[in-house]
Design a protein with these regions (language model features):
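N-terminal helix-turn-helix DNA-binding module of bacterial transcription factors
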Residues: 1-64
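Flexible loop/hinge segments that line or gate small-molecule binding clefts
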Residues: 140-177, 292-300, 304
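Short helix-capping segments at alpha-helix termini
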Residues: 95-99, 151, 223-230, 277-283
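Amphipathic helical "hinge" segments at domain boundaries
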Residues: 54-114
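Hydrophobic alpha-helical segments within soluble ligand-binding/sensing domains
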Residues: 170-196, 245-246, 311-328
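Hydrophobic alpha-helical
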Residues: 131-149, 233-294
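Hinge/cleft segment of the Venus flytrap/periplasmic-binding protein
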Residues: 46, 50, 206-207, 223, ...
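Hinge/beta->alpha junction and helix N-cap segments in small-molecule ligand-binding domains
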Residues: 74-83, 104-115, 172-178, 200-220, ...
């Protein structure tokens, strides 16, 4: 029987196929009342044949059971990476209502470790049935998940995966491989002996996110495999201090004349791009991550060589829906590690990119 037939099979159809009454099928499906062993065997055989699954969504609505999901994510402004992720949450929220599921969002400052510590303290006093966790601060997320395990609260990871945890699923790219992709995009455009600038946003209390560290590991690994003979130079930059960033980069590029490439491992490559455009440094190739508005504009203008994208809206949407299906239907995702495609965007194809594809 086809998948479409599976979804439309009715109790009356099962009764007809098993040669029993509708009432008998109802007693078996809902586990109420006695049924002869012969009829039970017939009905179970048909249920297996048609791959029947009871309508647990309708049952949940009828029972009045309410579920709450906690979505833990960085605070954002419109046009930033996490705004796209939030669009996926909003989209899933509309569908989650049919499961009697409501969503509560909890925000932290992704550039401030103490902000996440305070949020975890808040979450310990909250009651929720499942959680979507952005894993930027891996060293704090892992211990917190053990607390969720003890409470019997299922959770999914987004942004980057963490080993040694009991997550229901992960939705995101392979950060290591995404780093290798960026390295290839840059290395193929450089002489093997050229130097590379790595732009890093200054964090308060932490060296950077788990995802950025994994991307850098993949980046370095690829360069090493290719026999890269240049050097990596790190530029500690600030989010909203153009004068400071200009001074840092002027000094770095003046001291290291072999610099011909640049990369950032988060969504802020527009900072480096703005500097290169202002200084007319067309000799420096820049690769970054995420199709946010400012990055896309710099790519379209030819300042950015390439962007690596990871479909944040799909991550948010699928994370919420996986928890809904598990809580209400008892259905796990087909795979625990759900890697998004690693999309490569160039000036020639960015106008056709649909970042919101689920």
């Amino acid at each position: 029987m086809s998948d479409n037939e599976h979804t439309t099979v009715r109790i009356v159809d099962i009764a007809r196929m098993a040669g029993v009454s509708v009432a008998t099928v109802d007693r078996v499906i809902h586990n109420r009342g006695k049924v002869s062993e012969e009829n039970l065997a017939r009905i179970n055989e048909v249920l297996h044949e048609v791959n029947y699954r009871p309508n647990l969504i309708a049952r949940s609505l009828a029972s009045g059971r309410q579920y709450t999901l906690a979505v833990v994510m960085p605070r954002f402004a419109q046009g930033e990476y996490w705004a796209d992720f939030d669009a996926g949450i909003v989209r899933a929220e509309a569908e989650a209502r049919r499961y009697n599921v409501t969503i509560r969002k909890f925000f932290f400052d992704q550039y401030d470790r103490s902000s996440f510590e305070k949020l975890l303290a808040t979450l310990r006093g909250e009651t929720f049935d499942g959680a979507v966790l952005a894993t930027l601060f891996a060293e704090m997320v892992s211990p917190f998940t053990r607390e969720l395990d003890e409470r019997g609260v299922p959770y999914v990871f987004v942004d980057s995966n963490l080993p040694g945890c009991n997550q229901l699923a992960y939705f995101g790219t392979s950060s290591f491989d995404a780093g290798a992709v960026a390295a290839r995009l840059l290395y193929d455009r450089l002489d093997p002996g050229s130097d590379i600038v790595v732009g890093r946003i200054i964090h308060r209390g932490d060296a950077g996110s788990n995802q950025c560290r994994s991307r850098e590991e993949g980046f370095r690994s690829y360069l090493q495999q290719q026999g890269f003979r240049g050097k990596l130079h790190y530029a500690a930059l600030r989010l909203d201090d153009e004068a400071y960033n200009r001074e840092v980069l002027d000094d770095l590029l003046l001291k290291h004349r072999a610099i011909a490439g640049a990369v950032t491992f988060n969504s802020t490559c527009y900072i480096l791009a703005g500097y290169l455009a202002a200084r007319r440094r067309t000799d420096v190739r820049l690769v970054g991550y995420d199709v946010i508005r400012r990055n896309g504009q710099m790519l379209d203008e030819g300042v950015v060589t390439a962007l690596v994208a990871q479909r944040p809206e799909a991550q948010g949407y699928r994370g919420v829906m996986a928890l809904c299906e598990w809580l209400v239907e008892g259905r796990r995702p087909d795979t625990a590690e759900n890697n998004m495609p690693i999309d490569i965007l160039l000036k020639e194809n960015i106008r056709y990119y649909k970042n919101n594809l689920i």
